């Protein structure tokens, strides 16, 4: 067992996760090259004791805010894709809510921009000072789906009118897999879900490098087929 950063007593069972790194085999439309990184390549920031396991599926069960960071910095252009399922099986944390992610995240207040230079508790507001792209699918207890471009200012999480979706077609369905694709390709920043582009931003000052995290709060999520490669 390991104690994740910011969460005393949280359990982490070690195994392997299939992941495609941003490598030559991922470029040019080629099938992604799948690798098996060590569990040490991941960092957990959790408000309360949480349980995360790795295998063919990443299982994340948490009673409060949790960010699961891939520890290696990514450089654009990049596409991150995965399948996700919101578990509803009667468990204590089986709330269908908050399939979220940060990508191209950096801390503008520290040299090098590392998101790990400052210890964070896993509370959502503690990420306000990052420059990052953020998507929240089924946030606010599965009532909203939103995209934001953080600007590194505490208390300021800009939200454009077209980046705040409601309606059942934009929310999570219990126990059903959904495919998510996060894109940072020069000025083109986008989120795709099940083959449909739900958010797009023409960013005149794009975040071209940074870190990726899965993010949730009081929920039980399963993640599989995670790949990081070229758009």
Model-derived segments and their meaning:
Residues 26-231:
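Extracellular glycan-recognition regions
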Residues 15-24:
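Bacterial N-terminal signal peptides
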Residues 2-15:
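Bacterial N-terminal signal peptides that target proteins for export
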